């Protein structure tokens, strides 16, 4: 109930309808355009000429919009589109740091996805880990904060498994 499903339409690159081969990792991204909302980014993915997409976008108020079914490929992580679920995250400024509401929702969503897919907390990676792109920039520039994020996801996953 915490996810607002607004699937984008099938078109060219952003949503091809091609099935994932397997799900091996959850990839965290940042949108790269400070101050934009989850809805802004979802609507951008839905344009016919857009060549990128993500399974989820997490907004500045902590809202979560699902853009693609979990079983379909996104256009977000280059050669890893075939085996990853991608989460794009909104941020208020150029540092790329997530605000508290956004951070809380990203942790919750990531843990839920790990539980749903049977993956572990070790299966959470940055776009940077796939391509070397500075994404999400805050967590590339602050590896200690990335480790803290992954620890928070593992804690949340453990709590979900207890329920």
Segments predicted by a language model, with ranges:
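Basic/polar, cationic surfaces and motifs that engage anionic cell-wall
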Residues: 1-9, 13-16, 20, 92-163
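N-terminal catalytic cores of peptidoglycan-degrading enzymes
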Residues: 1-78
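Hydrophobic faces of well-ordered beta-strands that scaffold small-molecule active sites
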Residues: 28, 85-87, 124-126
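Cell-envelope and extracellular/periplasmic
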Residues: 32, 80, 85-95
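General N-terminal targeting signals
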Residues: 43-45, 73-75, 81-84, 102, ...
């Amino acid at each position: 109930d915490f996810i607002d499903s607004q699937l984008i339409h099938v078109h060219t690159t952003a949503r091809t309808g091609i099935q994932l081969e397997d799900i091996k990792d959850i990839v965290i991204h940042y949108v790269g355009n400070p101050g934009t909302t989850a809805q802004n980014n979802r609507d951008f993915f839905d344009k016919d000429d857009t060549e990128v997409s993500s399974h989820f976008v997490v907004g500045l108020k902590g809202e979560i919009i699902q853009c693609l079914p979990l079983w379909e490929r996104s256009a977000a992580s280059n050669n890893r589109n075939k085996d990853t679920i991608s989460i794009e995250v909104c941020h208020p400024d150029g540092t790329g740091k997530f605000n508290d509401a956004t951070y809380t929702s990203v942790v919750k969503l990531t843990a839920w996805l790990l539980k749903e897919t049977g993956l572990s907390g070790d299966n959470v990676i940055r776009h940077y880990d796939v391509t070397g792109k500075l994404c999400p920039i805050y967590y590339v520039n602050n590896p200690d904060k990335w480790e803290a994020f992954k620890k928070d996801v593992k804690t949340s996953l453990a709590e979900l498994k207890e329920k």
